[in-house]
Amino acid sequence: MQRICIPDYEYQERIAKAAKLVAAKGLDAMLVVSTESDYANARYFSGFWPLFERAGVLIGASGKAVLLVGPESAIFAKDFGKIDKVMVLKEFRESADPAYPELVPDTFKMAFDYVGATGENLKIGLGSYVECTLPIMEGLKDTFPKAEISICSDIMVALRSIKSENELACIREGFRIVELATDEVVKALKPGVTELQMVGVAQRVIYENGAEYEGLPMYVFSESSTRHAISRSTYKVIGKNDIVQLNLSAKIDGYSPAIGLPVFMGKAEGEKKEIVEFCLKMHNWTTENLKAGIPADRIPKQFLQMFKDAGYEKNYVYGPCHGTGMIEVEAPWMETSSDYMLKENMTFQVDTFVSGSTFGCRWEKGIAIKENGVESYTDYLEKHGLIELGF
């Protein structure tokens, strides 16, 4: 069976598209930087996911590109990466900050010369400003003290927000695997198991069925921990009357979709049932009202107003969708302040989170924007609805 992945030629297409956008902004070159945990921008162009060290891709307006890695990753990057030219820069070293006294590294000057960005008065764009570490920024400034360094993350949002057919295939495959993992975790849930034991069940299933890694640190939270919008699973023992929040994910060639739903160990009652059902209602409303051609702030504004009208404003945490792709949460978000239009093949997680007095709840799935609605990549929530295990 052929593995679902991004073909090599698509990486070259991405670099070519980026180079045109770099030139159109009047830049000489764009640098994107990634870490092990937030690998997306460098991997988007190179297929390379760093370990311990940082990685970067430098793209010139000329169309040439070079993969930049730390001192221990030269062979690793050449074996895994999709960019032929690899340079080793000390600025991309790991956080232990080794001196590497015997190393003769490449330099930023060599990298910029390679992509055709020569001279001193360069215009350099940072395509991933948030991920850019201080040693890398200082290295740029020391090498090019006369350069104009600006943020051009809008280039990366423009490239990554609309997915190709190969990207959509990776996302679909991830959801197929997450459905299998969710089934097995629900079957394994019982009073007395720990949150981390259930994470172990999910990890086994995703690897057995073709995932390269977790798409996110998988969530199995119980009772008070379900109030956490983001968190980590623990050794906490799950009780027979607990509400358990699942958010499971599988990574396919970097693409990281997730499914989230609450599970009642006993029976859904009282405030818990009311809030969980309201959360599901808002989740379904969001899905039904998304389509290409509408302003991205329309749904969030209506979403927030519906919370207010229903008396749940105090339970509102954030609004209804965030971009998804190589990172489970990526730009753009849909917020009340958003100022872009929804376009076909933008992909989002419909992420509906509500916080109660002693618990929280999330219903979550992935969709692609289409002309007259959305393509949903899982029907798991529709098929199973509110799960009560009856312990």
Region locations from a protein language model:
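Active-site neighborhoods and metal-handling regions in enzymes and metal-associated proteins
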Residues: 1-391
